[in-house]
Structures are given as structure tokens and as C-alpha cells.
Amino acid sequence: MLDIKRIRTDFEAVAEKLATRGVDAAVLNEMKEIDAKRRNILVKVETLKAERNTVSAEIAQAKRNKENTDDKIAAMQNLSAEVKALDAELAEIDAKLTEFTTTLPNIPADSVPVGADEDDNVEVRRWGTPREFDFEPKAHWDLGEDLGILDWERGGKVTGARFLFYKGLGARLERAIYNFMLDEHGKEGYTEVITPYIVNHDSMFGTGQYPKFKEDTFELSDTNFVLIPTAEVPLTNYYRDEILDGKDLPIYFTAMSPSFRSEAGSAGRDTRGLIRLHQFHKVEMVKFAKPEESYEELEKMTANAENILQKLNLPYRVVALSTGDMGFSAAKTYDLEVWIPAQNNYREISSCSNTEDFQARRAQIRYRDEADGKVKLLHTLNGSGLAVGRTVAAILENYQNEDGSVTIPEALRPYMGGAEVIKP
């Protein structure tokens, strides 16, 4: 959520920044006018309350003097009626302001590339060289079916489109991947957490999914509960409405969880395979940091995600997302895109973002600065470390052999009982 004071005092700069995210200046102007009206009403209310207090004191004095108080009582009643009417108007204005501030995206950092969409993203670096095959590489969905480790047909029968069963070494591979990821992040100082997979609406508001993106989620009917779209939600809300000790920052959390997404608006995209599912496993990283340290922590988090891909020897690239392609809550985002041979393209496998104080303001996560003792909003960061299903897809395609088998990456073999190959 944006700071209304920043919009008020630095309006032109904020409007210019948000314009790069598709926010019409007219919306901000309307918000500014409503805020000005609110402040004027507040002044009137305080003035009227002061007058009412004065009249109340005069009435008390008049009664002590046994004087007639009818006129003063009538005046106080009129003042109270005016205050009540203005309070009602103020409540309506506050509701409008809340609607504005909760649906506007975060202000992009100065270092974010300006652009309309993913075509304006900027490649930062690459790692590894895509493998050259001396045979036609298969898509991971065909490999998975031929190996008998991925079953979309029965997933569709039991549930519906974009669901599947992992079987045998496929299930073992999925489990090996996320255990490996959690172990690697643990080495980097992340505390492993098992979170609830169901959260309440306040938690969804805190991280920015609600109210703007309700259609992308799975709500439990007639309840206050939602299936988590990512472990970012419970991990970030762990400290909601709390004040942390500044000396304890930064704090690192990691968790593996299922993620549930309706994929509204994704009809026709990635209809086959593991790239876009309604339910998938993901290892998440979340950080709580002081404002002056958060961008250094973003670079470290991105490196933590890269470490997984490097140890799995999967070629990838890092791109800085443009203002038009970033997520709602992000001030800056790096995407990691892994090489998918059958698509001859890089596809997103991780997204690492600094939300600055955007989520912290919504969730009221603060810290007490040990230097001056003041309570301040901290910065929150989140990143995939990594999407597990997409990692399975990348391994199947990059490690496939001409005979249809798939070599298991060396880093995962200790997690798979020493198995080296998945064979038909």
C-alpha cells in the first residue's frame, strides 16, 4: 500500500513513476482532491468539537449560576449534529481513499527498466550454455508419459485440466528437488518453516493479493479462508501487526508448500506440461530487512535462487523486469529463466522481488530502530527458490537421452537413493 503522505508531498514524481505502470494521472488527481477534501473536513470537525467543548463548559457554568441554558443547549445540539454529519462524510471519503491506496501498484525503484510489458525486460546475465542435441529433444510432458512418471490423463479424470499425478521416480524426483532446495537455502541462513496452506483474507490483503486479484485465487465458500497461491503469503504475514527488534534484522525464512492458482486470464497458455498448473509445489524465500539493506538483500536472494540452478547445471538467464511487467507489490524484480530445449526458449522458474515497505504498510510489520528507538516500517522481500514443477520440466528436457531415458543430476542423486537414470 502506498504512503498517502508521499503522494501528497511528492505528487508529480509519484504520478510520473506510476504512469510507467499504467496508472492514469487522472486517478491520482482524483485521489489528491479527495485527500485534500478529507483534510479540510478534519479541520472543520476539530474546530466544531472545540466550539462544542467551549459551549459545554459555558452550559456547566450557567447551571452553576442558575442561568437559563436553553440557547446554549440548542447551540451544542446543532454543533453535535454538524459533527455527526461531517463524521459520516469523512467515513465515506476514508472508504474511497482506502479503495485508491489498496488498488494502486507499488512505485518502481529508479533502477527498474521503463517499459510496457515483458518485451521491455532487460537481460542482466546468463549462466551455462544450452545443450546441443544430436537428436530431436522431446517435450517434458512426452518424456514424463513415456517414462510412466507423469500422468495427466488420470489427473484430468480425478480433478480436471491442469492437474496431474507424479508416480514412482517422478514423485521421488519432485521430492528430491524440494528437499535439495530447502537444504541449500538452510546453508545460506534461511530458517525452514512449514506454513498453513490456508490463510485468511487479512493475510491475502497484507501481501497484496486482495482485494485486486481475488479472481486468481481459490476461496473456500462461505468462509474467511483461501488456499495459498504461494508460501509468500503465510511467511510474510507471520509478523503481521508486530514490531520487531531492529538488531534481529534481516530475518530469512524458507518454506516448501503447494501453491493453488486459478490462472484466471491464462486460457490457452501452456495448456500442456508442468509450466502452468492449478496446483504445484514451490520453495519460497522471504526476507524482512531494514530499508537501507533491502536492495543488497535482493541481490543475495537472487544469488540464492541462482545457486540452485547452477548446482543442477541448468542453463538460465537473469532479467530485470520492466515497470509494465512487474507484479503489483514489487518495487523491483529479477526473474530467473531456465532453458527449455523443446521450446528453444528460456522460461521463468523464479521471481525475486523487493516490495520495499509496500507489504509492510498493508500488514503493519514494523521494527524498532536500535539507533534512535523509533518504530519504522521495514522492507519485505520474496522469491521463488524455485518452482519445483518447472524444475522437473527443465531437468527432464535438459538431461534427456536419445533412448528416452533421463539422467538424474548429480546433486540430486543422494536424495534419490543413488539412482542415476530414469529409464522407460
UniProtKB/Swiss-Prot annotation:
CDD domains on file: SerRS_core
Domain of life, source organism: Bacteria
Catalysed reaction, written as an equation: tRNA(Ser) + L-serine + ATP = L-seryl-tRNA(Ser) + AMP + diphosphate + H(+); tRNA(Sec) + L-serine + ATP = L-seryl-tRNA(Sec) + AMP + diphosphate + H(+)
Binding-site list for L-serine: 230-232, 284, 384
Gene3D superfamilies tied to this protein: Bira Bifunctional Protein, Domain 2 (3.30.930.10), Serine-tRNA synthetase, tRNA binding domain (1.10.287.40)
HAMAP family, per the entry: Ser_tRNA_synth_type1
Subunit composition and interactions: Homodimer. The tRNA molecule binds across the dimer.
Physiological role: Catalyzes the attachment of serine to tRNA(Ser). Is also able to aminoacylate tRNA(Sec) with serine, to form the misacylated tRNA L-seryl-tRNA(Sec), which will be further converted into selenocysteinyl-tRNA(Sec).
Protein name: Serine--tRNA ligase
Species of the source: Streptococcus pneumoniae serotype 4 (strain ATCC BAA-334 / TIGR4)
